[in-house]
């Protein structure tokens, strides 16, 4: 008799994706972040669902409903902080996952990579809309500033912004539609994750050497299920430590003040995981130029497979590219720091230099390093 997991139509799909899936025998812990992202998504949907049961998307009551969740709902504060800090964990895993893809040349699987970029944009949009929902000062002004960027689009900009707002300013209509989309998008993300996995399983996983591993595969279960559980334990330990000991460490104190359209906070800034893009936006004095740079800072990932000049896929044996990669990582940390600083000397010039370096490394220096390394191999 055939094992049910191999014969049942539904179990067969699960079996071929998570149990009997042939995986390279040498993939490192950098390959753990895919499963961690799946767990983060499940956690966000679950905590978000319970929060939505108590939240009201009305400008008069939104702030108070969040306070009510923290004070009066059983373990409401745990739900709220798990959801808020879970988003931070989500983005940490997301950025490390993309970094892994860049380092080991996983972007050569173009379909998987491109779906991943669309996923990144969707997750960023979802997180932005979620940040608006508590209706604190930073929620309101963040929504005003970021949606206002669309007014830089020639001809249709102003109409587009007012259409998104549902009026002439960020108000009740904006909050209601942001809540609706914030609730809907995670389910769309879940569907896109399945497409992401579908494309990945067409080609199989990459590995640290960048060399095809078809002749040396091992079953996903038990080897990588155990490995993923270890990653999960480490991540959950970090998340719970954050939630239970300093839940507001990554938040903005201004968001504990109810939204007031008549009082602008001294420094309007997004959550920490958007600061690098915000720094790039601010580094260009022109509004439209800044918006284009902001979009291109993420969209530049699309052209990376076409800028791959090296004969080797992975950076494991390419010291010059490795130096540039870690310079890029340091540059992104610098941009994140700059994004949280006020717009004054010397932060302005540091931000501008870091922004130029960011695009230069990706578009010019990395392809050049690949060509140089090809020549070095001939020697």
Swiss-Prot record:
Keywords: Electron transport, Heme, Iron, Membrane, Metal-binding, Mitochondrion, Mitochondrion inner membrane, Respiratory chain, Transmembrane, Transmembrane helix, Transport, Ubiquinone. One of its GO terms (biological process) is mitochondrial electron transport, ubiquinol to cytochrome c. Heme b b566 binds at residues 97, 196. Binds 2 heme b groups non-covalently. Its main location: mitochondrion. One of its GO terms (molecular function) is ubiquinol-cytochrome-c reductase activity. Its cofactor is heme b. It is a multi-pass membrane protein. The chain crosses the membrane at residues 33-53, 77-98, 113-133, 178-198, 226-246, 288-308, 320-340, 347-367. It is found in: Mitochondrion inner membrane. Pfam families: Cytochrom_B_C, Cytochrome_B. Heme b b562 binds at residues 83, 182. SUPFAM superfamilies: a domain/subunit of cytochrome bc1 complex (Ubiquinol-cytochrome c reductase) (SSF81648), Transmembrane di-heme cytochromes (SSF81342). A ubiquinone binds at residue 201. Belongs to the cytochrome b family. Component of the ubiquinol-cytochrome c reductase complex (complex III or cytochrome b-c1 complex) that is part of the mitochondrial respiratory chain. The b-c1 complex mediates electron transfer from ubiquinol to cytochrome c. Contributes to the generation of a proton gradient across the mitochondrial membrane that is then used for ATP synthesis. The cytochrome bc1 complex contains 11 subunits: 3 respiratory subunits (MT-CYB, CYC1 and UQCRFS1), 2 core proteins (UQCRC1 and UQCRC2) and 6 low-molecular weight proteins (UQCRH/QCR6, UQCRB/QCR7, UQCRQ/QCR8, UQCR10/QCR9, UQCR11/QCR10 and a cleavage product of UQCRFS1). This cytochrome bc1 complex then forms a dimer. This is Cytochrome b. It comes from Murina leucogaster. The gene is MT-CYB.
